[in-house]
Each structure stands twice: as structure tokens, then as C-alpha cells.
Amino acid sequence: FRHSKDGKFIYLRYELKKAIYVYTYKTGDRAPVIEKIQTISTTSTKKPDNLTAACAMRMSVDQKYIYCTNAGENTISVYKRDEETGLLTMICCLPISGAYPKDVAVFPDGRHIASVNHDSGTISFFKVDYEKGLLVMSGRSIPVNEPNCCAIVKIGD
């Protein structure tokens, strides 16, 4: 799961339901008050097959966007996050040029992502065009042996 920096919203990925559930979060007198406010699909089809699974979910550094990988369908979904309501709107769900995207890493600039593709043994890189709703592949994929996860860290200024 992921949560907003202000602590008001929780984003929970349901792998086999192929969905992201959005919750509000408030502190209560005795216990937290958590309320589901949205269920949104992670796939591009209305009836994805049973072999599709929502594998990984990441949030951009500025928390304006959420990304989710879909294994089986071999796509990445990109969502715009409303900072006031917490609700998500799908911008795109596009192929990643690899098989079984197990993770997605967001570059510090928030305009590039890397898809970690387990079954094809590759890492694919994309520029995200938020305005047009596109993932544009940036060069060739890098071969790696059965990758599972990835982190991209900014070093220096």
C-alpha cells in the first residue's frame, strides 16, 4: 500500500482483483477512522483474464501520480491523483514491451519510469507524457536475469 504525505489517503493494491482501493484516513477518539471512497481497475480491459495480476504500485515523488504494473496483461497503468479528494483518474494503461512486469520504479524527475520485467529478463525505460496519456519507450531494454524489484535514487543535487 501507499499513503499520501498528508496522511489523509491510503492506496491499497489488490493483486488478484486487479484494482486499487482508495481510502480516507482520520484519527478517531479510540481508533483510526478508515473509509473506502473508490475502487479503480488496474487493467485496460473490462474483463481481464485470470492470469492477469496487479503486481506493483508506486507513487511519484510529488505524489501527483500513481503507477501500477499488470502481469499477464503486461501493461503499466498511470493515474492522476487529486490532492484534495484523493481520487484517482486513469491516464493510460499501455504495454511495457516485456513480460511479467513485477515492479515499476519512478525516476526523481517524475517524467520517466522503469519497468522491471521478470519473465522476459529485462528492464524497460519510458518517458511518461501525462498530457497525451502515453508511455514512450526510451531506448532499448536492458537484459537482466529474472529481475524482481528496482529502486532509483537521486544522488546529489
Features from the language model and the residues they span:
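C-terminal hydrophobic structural anchor segments
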Residues: 77-127
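A short beta-strand motif characteristic of beta-propeller blades
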Residues: 38-47, 89-95, 138-141
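Internal helix-turn-beta structural module
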Residues: 112-149
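Acidic, glycine-rich loop-and-beta core segments that form the ion-binding/anion-interacting portion
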Residues: 1-43
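Beta-rich, blade/repeat-based domains predominating
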Residues: 1-9, 42-62, 97-112, 144-157
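Short loop/turn segments immediately following beta-strands, especially the blade-tip
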Residues: 23-33, 79-86, 127-134
